[in-house]
């Protein structure tokens, strides 16, 4: 399976050490042994596919779709709403999380809420509604998320992997501190100079204190990714179900 990815010209991913979008910033990045390389356009993306790497384009509107004509399209923006994806975009269209309705604007939806149904493929209807409450990790939910204290430009003070305690300042905006409310390891944080608005998710503290988790895909990412793969294989006819 060949994969091409697109993102914003200035990605806002928090867990940058496990995000292929970093290829847009660095030119090349690697996640668990899989390499991703920045592509200038769709033609270069096709060339990079022959090198067995993941091409990443700064193409927030996915205009490359017209050239690449993918067999499957996955909207993993996680905006909690549909920003324009249509069921006619590709033979198989998959929406990730709330905001999509299988059968209306996509062929399948993959559940993103932590819990019993995480990663489940939905072929009719929608994912569970957004609660604005992060899932539990190490006994903590909303406390582990770091949010911008004001509108402005984010100033990064700590790196991913840094050990912190409650009260430590991980970043600041307009001189206002963004403090950690629990102890643990900084699992993700926005890069220096990112424009933010008050309350915007700007970092994440993992209370389990396992630095190695910063460089590997999470259980949630693996579950959702598995759901995406299942949906693509099923909807494309690669998975054929037979009666016992």
Please provide the spans of the model-predicted regions.
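Accessory, usually C-terminal, subdomains that scaffold auxiliary metal cofactors
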Residues: 191, 197-204, 208-223
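Conserved small/polar residues in nucleotide/adenosyl-binding loops
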Residues: 241-244
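Generic structural motif
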Residues: 71, 107-108, 114-116, 123-171, ...
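Buried, small/hydrophobic-residue-enriched core segments of structured protein domains
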Residues: 1-125, 216-237
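C-terminal, active-site-flanking charged/polar segments
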Residues: 2, 188, 196
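Flexible, active-site-proximal loop/turn residues at the rims of small-molecule/cofactor binding pockets
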Residues: 79, 176, 208
